[in-house]
């Protein structure tokens, strides 16, 4: 007697990240038809990431007026930017996600001026915003724009926060398989999936985007064993089919 799985499994392998081009998961999903749920194989140490924050990158520009530094002329765009950056460091949103926690804000780049004796009329800085389901990405951008003197332009608003609740079979199966659940601080293709998904895969997220990024062979072996156990637990959640 055999026990086929009570669902179909489709393996999708994508080489593009969620923030890159259109030939990765964006091209794959329309070809799959209806999808009920997904398991995303990003490196998590084979623990179960039940949610992840979204991402909005803001290109900000402070506008001033050029002048000679010795004569105290002009309006220093760098100072305007610094005031905005200080405001961002202590900024708090009115709502906080129960699953994903607070929205994260980090200024990661700044550029101003070309000469030591000229007051800069422009200062550009970049803000990395890790969004949650407490606000849409568009709402988050609007709130931050209202708080800043600088112009703020989002590169994209499509990388959205995502989470799956503890009562979903994806999560219940992970717990039954002995996996710890947590909220991932990083984004993945999960954010582009309009259906419940869990992130769990071999390797360590701390190695991502580093020189000579790698996954150990023993981590792959562990991953295979965990996936087998997990799929079995997930099948139990949906009820095994038995053929006589």
For each of these PLM feature ranges, what is it?
Residues 15-17, 43, 48-51, 57-244:
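Metal-dependent amide/peptide-bond hydrolase catalytic core
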């Amino acid at each position: 007697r055999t026990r086929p799985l009570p669902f179909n499994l489709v393996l999708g392998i994508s080489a593009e990240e969620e923030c890159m081009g259109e030939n990765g998961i964006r091209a794959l999903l329309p070809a799959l038809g209806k999808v009920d749920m997904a398991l995303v194989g990003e490196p998590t140490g084979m623990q179960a990431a039940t949610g992840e924050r979204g991402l909005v990158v803001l290109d900000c520009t402070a506008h001033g007026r050029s002048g000679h530094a010795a004569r105290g002329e002009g309006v220093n765009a760098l100072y305007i930017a610094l005031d905005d950056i200080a405001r961002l460091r202590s900024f708090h949103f009115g709502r906080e996600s129960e699953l994903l926690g607070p929205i994260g804000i980090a200024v990661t780049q700044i550029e101003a001026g070309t000469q030591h004796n000229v007051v800069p009329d422009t200062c550009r800085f970049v803000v990395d915003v890790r969004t949650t389901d407490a606000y849409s990405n568009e709402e988050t951008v609007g709130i931050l724009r209202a708080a800043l003197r600088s112009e703020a332009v989002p590169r994209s608003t499509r990388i959205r926060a995502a989470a799956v609740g503890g009562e979903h079979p994806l999560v219940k199966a992970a717990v039954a398989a002995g996996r710890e659940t947590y909220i991932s601080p990083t984004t993945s293709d999960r954010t582009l999936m309009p259906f419940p998904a869990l992130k769990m895969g071999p390797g360590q997220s701390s190695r991502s985007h580093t020189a000579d990024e790698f996954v150990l062979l023993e981590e792959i072996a562990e991953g295979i064993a965990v996936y087998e156990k997990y799929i079995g637990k997930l099948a139990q959640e949906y009820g095994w089919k038995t053929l006589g």
